[in-house]
Amino acid sequence: NDMAIFNFQTGKPNIIKVIGVGGGGGNAVNHMYNEGIHDVSFVVCNTDNKALQDSPVPNKIQLGSEGLGAGNRPEKARQATEESIEDIKKMFSDGTKMAFITAGMGGGTGTGAAPIIAKVAKDMGILTVGIVTIPFRWEGNRKIDQALDGVEEISRNVDALLVINNERLRELYQELTVTNAFAKADDTLCNAARSIAEII
């Protein structure tokens, strides 16, 4: 079963795991991985097989068997994640003590899958921290409403939740282009996870 690929190097610290779920979370984790943060292990989880293949992160879980993404439908991502629940449990069964679940809320996979992955970790007694973004205003009300539902759901399944409001970030950095705005959001996610990991 090549749906879940784990290449955790032995002797490497698996105590803190940073899990990127969906497009936004995956981008943030790819970015952190490329920055060479060493004291944590990284995993990307996605319903979109292509996004997983494009990720430099060696540890990946494809959620569900289709591999075609969730098409902005959290319900579809939820079903896919339930299908892959054993892979998710296995990912956490290596001595993980703390998990950061990072996702962009508002799309399908981040919104639907992240709360379930967080719940698995928390149910296993792992200290679970959610770091999520909510969309820019121009992404539309439907996406924002969907994101807020996701935030509410993940908040029930984590020990701590950090919500990064992309719109607020844009107000702080008014000169940002759209691409840079997303990059800045990724940076903020990275810095948050890195800071918390260093405290511990």
Please place each PLM-identified region on the residue numbering.
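Tubulin/FtsZ superfamily GTPase core signature
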Residues: 1-200
